[in-house]
UniProtKB/Swiss-Prot annotation:
InterPro entries: 6-hairpin_glycosidase_sf, 6hp_glycosidase-like_sf, AGE/CE, AGE_dom
Modified residues (Phosphoserine): S418
Subunit organization: Homodimer. Forms a heterodimer with renin and inhibits its activity.
Family assignment from sequence similarity: Belongs to the N-acylglucosamine 2-epimerase family.
Gene that encodes it: Renbp
EC number: 5.1.3.8
Organism: Rattus norvegicus
GO biological process: carbohydrate metabolic process; N-acetylglucosamine metabolic process; N-acetylmannosamine metabolic process; N-acetylneuraminate catabolic process
Tissue and organ expression note: Kidney, adrenal gland, brain, lung, spleen, ovary, testis and heart.
The protein, known as: N-acylglucosamine 2-epimerase
Amino acid sequence: MEKERETLQVWKQRVGQELDSVIAFWMEHSHDQEHGGFFTCLGRDGQVYDHLKYVWLQGRQVWMYCRLYRTFERFRRVELLDAAKAGGEFLLSYARVAPPGKKCAFVLTQDGRPVKVQRTIFSECFYTMAMNELWKVTGEMHYQREAVEMMDQIIHWVREDPAGLGRPQLSGTLATEPMAVPMMLLNLVEQLGEEDEEMTDKYAELGDWCAHRILQHVQRDGQVVLENVSEDGKELPGCLGRHQNPGHTLEAGWFLLQYALRKGDPKLQRHIIDKFLLLPFHSGWDPEHGGLFYFQDADDLCPTQLEWNMKLWWPHTEAMIAFLMGYRDSGDPALLNLFYQVAEYTFHQFRDPEYGEWFGYLNQEGKVALTIKGGPFKGCFHVPRCLAMCEQILGALLQRLGPAPLGSLPAVPTREGSK
């Protein structure tokens, strides 16, 4: 037990120090003091290389800052909250393409003019997360009204009428359900329902619906999890049907673990661990170089995506959360060992001890392919969310072990030593 305690304590200190470093990077380099919001196109040293603003990443950074402010005493800093509020007001003013319509842009200029719209729900989802978390830290009801109105619009698009998304219904297009849609909705159900009984009750049926739809992606008698299935939960033909995304499956896994914990369903929990944690890890982990492949083909054919064998930052952060949460909920030591395996690889390969933050894109061998720290898809989200959640779970695990004997805790490593 003492060896376990020592290892957990070392990792708690390690992720906590890394979280401090990562947030310091974004606070120093990403804030737009003129217009509000955040620059995410940042080079290795934090230099801004493009001033476009991506609505997904604006919402994510507002959410991240607010979540840290609300749940970590050391992040209860006025400059963090002020930046989050400025980002939230930027979103309120500019994210929607044609107010009072709810459709949000994907890309905005620095001063908020729309550049591009995606015909999906994801800009709106991250907008909702940002507004709800802003309400939780400020108590200002206009943020919560905005969150609930947007949530209800998203539900309408997904479950009743998608016409407002602007996607043409072409005769040759397969009716497809990507796992990302029920995943994101389940995440929003968790977000809005946290410590809010009214919202929990309002969206309970939606949470059940989302979980059921995600579980339909387990196919071939439980041997694979597919990224896309038909609307009635069957495997689709061709590359689209065989497409697998191990990192996405692992992320869905910890979303589902939260759902199973809320439901008090240990049988579902075990199924999730087997199919959404262990299955994608064992098929997706590169046995030669380590790390998770980005994409795979369920029949072991060559994937068509050029980046299929690259190692990206976010599948590894999601794996860290999933395995640590799985261990917390099940007590299975194999899951804790997998957390350590993924975390060691991730910290060694992605961290940049010289300039801070993490590289996002490695080649198959684990060498840095892109030196940027942020871009159209990488912002202040997956890395700090992972570090914050892991620090909290590790703290809970240490509490579960009880107080340490006097003199048994390891010394806290210095920031230099942790590099």
